[in-house]
Amino acid sequence: MYRIMNVLDTINAATARGVTRFAFELLPPLKGDGTRGVFTAVDNVVEYDPAYINVTFHREGLKQTVRPDGRADWHLVRRRPGTVGISAAIQNRYGIDVVPHLICGGLSQYDIEDALIDMDFLGLHNVLALRGDAGANERMFMPHPQGHSHAVELVRQIAAMNRGEFVDGEVDICHHSRFSIGVAGYPETHADAVSPEDDIMRLKEKVEAGADYVVTQMFFDNGRYFDYVRRCREAGITVPIIPGLKPLVSPRHLRTLPATFSTHIPDELRRAVEACGDDAAKVREAGIEWSVMQARELKAAGVPVIHFYTMSKTENIARIAKSVF
């Protein structure tokens, strides 16, 4: 039986010891899949002692059903349910703390409360609080009628539950949850932000609401992370800011990542990937080499944890971990 910690404890312990550890992010299985693929992804890296593992939360998507008469119906279906369940399965199997993601989109405050109760019962004492993206049938993000519009509201709800306060206010409480709350930060500014300064003020609101640490969106230029941390500190944000890295694995990333995440691809990395042509193996090597370079510089700067975005493909993370950690 492993000792239950929370992510903030883990980050602070690494800081106190002067070491850098790594964490990574997995997707829950597609509906109909079992746990094998997720466990294999963890098996690839477990020997390098990950600090913790994140598991993403996915909204519903549109699915078409064709009737016998040829007419089509569209339904909202979650293709990747099971975030809480697979998080508990990983934590129980490996004794590594797991951080389920929880989003605002598509959920009422009561849905969120029920999910948090399940997490608490299962020994999941960490959560990453996110607004989430627009639903498949939405042009822009629309909150549930009984839900939250912004991540800061979700943070407030989780922090309130830690104090024994529930949505309906009618519970005779004798047990308080103790979630460590993470939130997202954007070194290159959230797409919906009015300005970089406003974006940092929104982050400060999340911290003041109860967030314990920040995980950044992916970046490929460490200078942008260091500048972001400086600006956050100047704004009075003192919690740990964990850098997020993603190894490039496809030439398409040169186009899709900036378009989707407003992420800058440095010219040196772009040239290295373009020089690989359509050779997928060479592209992966270039992505690994760049991530190793980034991780070594971040480690030298004393960051306590580096978070890797993986899409559940962890073979390259194992190679990076072997080289850096």
Language-model segments: residues:
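N-terminal amphipathic alpha-helix/helix-capping segment at the start of soluble metabolic enzymes
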Residues: 1-24, 31, 166-179, 325
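Active-site pocket-lining/capping segments in soluble small-molecule metabolic enzymes
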Residues: 4, 132, 145-176, 183-192, ...
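Active-site mouth loops of central-metabolism enzymes
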Residues: 21-39, 97-110, 180-198, 274-289
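Conserved, mostly hydrophobic/aromatic
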Residues: 25, 53, 119, 206, ...
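Glycine-rich, proline-tolerant flexible connector loops at the mouths of alpha/beta enzymes
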Residues: 29, 48-81, 135-146, 211-228, ...
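Catalytic cores of alpha/beta
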Residues: 108-121, 198-202, 227-230, 250-256, ...
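Flexible, glycine-rich active-site loops centered on histidine and acidic residues
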Residues: 109-157
